[in-house]
Amino acid sequence: MDEKRLTHLRQLEAESIHIIREVAAEFGNPVMMYSIGKDSSVMLHLARKAFYPGSLPFPLLHVDTGWKFREMYEFRDHTAKAYGCELLVHRNPQGEALGINPFVHGSAKHTDIMKTEGLKQALDKYGFDAAFGGARRDEEKSRAKERIYSFRDRFHRWDPKNQRPELWHNYNGQINKGESIRVFPLSNWTELDIWQYIYLENIDIVPLYLAAPRPVVERDGMLLMVDDDRIDLQPGEVIEQRMVRFRTLGCWPLTGAVASHAQTLPEIIEEMLVSTTSERQGRVIDRDQSGSMELKKRQGYF
């Protein structure tokens, strides 16, 4: 297809579909990570387009920490059922047995045990040799230098100094037994691209992305939504209703909301056009060196 005939979004769409089909043809046991957010929703939509009218030739995998927003769980189950997708859900049993949680053990330990170790357990359990992820290069500096085909050793570790060249849309998927590839079909998309494509294609998203009155507490300069009774209120903290939405979604005690009145997709897009901050400013796990994205990726995180 002549790229000159495609709009910017259609070029991105075509590239992503090409990558998804390439992985399905090249690897023996691929899986698509499904974290329930906007990027996962776009990636799933692209995968369904790639193999329409057939079904997906790989399952979805959600590595669950037990601390996602309730609306995320409802959306996950509804989506898998509506689209007829095979959904695998994995929780780290050792972490559950130890009662690991972000309030008691902190964001770094919670993320390492429930997310990173949970992910590695799931990949080993099912023997996946390729895993799709919805990460984009504009999100964060370590992701900006990562390849579309991201090689991982048999311990699931990423070495930024040992990456393969990717020239003219040619990807090297050769691996030895026990090694794997993380694949990022949305690498060249921006946050604005994602929202414009969601609007263009009428893709369903978790309602948390739209502004609404929600119960929040202000902590360390962030607005944390009180999603259930496990909240650990600190002295002086008061729960109040504010008009907020989320630019990124994760575990609710570690994800800050933003004050907003954007209740429709066009209003979100309008916000994006004037925004000067990263969507990951609301992620507690990105705020200190021990929780840096590159360090987590070296240890096996997505």
UniProtKB/Swiss-Prot annotation:
Could you mention a single GO BP entry for this protein? hydrogen sulfide biosynthetic process
In terms of InterPro entries, this protein maps to:
PAPS_reduct_dom (IPR002500), Rossmann-like_a/b/a_fold (IPR014729), SO4_adenylTrfase_ssu (IPR011784), Sulfate_adenylyltrnsfr_sub2 (IPR050128)
UniProt keyword terms in alphabetical order: ATP-binding, Nucleotide-binding, Nucleotidyltransferase, Transferase
Q: What is its EC number?
A: 2.7.7.4
Enumerate the catalysed reactions.
Answer: sulfate + ATP + H(+) = adenosine 5'-phosphosulfate + diphosphate
What Pfam families would the database entry show?
PAPS_reduct (PF01507)
Tell me the route in metabolism or biology where this protein functions.
Sulfur metabolism; hydrogen sulfide biosynthesis; sulfite from sulfate: step 1/3
A GO molecular function held by the record:
sulfate adenylyltransferase (ATP) activity
NCBIfam families, per database record: CysD (TIGR02039), PRK05253.1 (NF003587), PRK12563.1 (NF009214)
The family assignment reads: Belongs to the PAPS reductase family. CysD subfamily.
Q: How does it assemble?
A: Heterodimer composed of CysD, the smaller subunit, and CysN.
Q: What role does it play?
A: With CysN forms the ATP sulfurylase (ATPS) that catalyzes the adenylation of sulfate producing adenosine 5'-phosphosulfate (APS) and diphosphate, the first enzymatic step in sulfur assimilation pathway. APS synthesis involves the formation of a high-energy phosphoric-sulfuric acid anhydride bond driven by GTP hydrolysis by CysN coupled to ATP hydrolysis by CysD.
> This chain belongs to which protein, by name?
Sulfate adenylyltransferase subunit 2
Q: Which organism is it from?
A: Pectobacterium atrosepticum (strain SCRI 1043 / ATCC BAA-672) (Erwinia carotovora subsp. atroseptica)
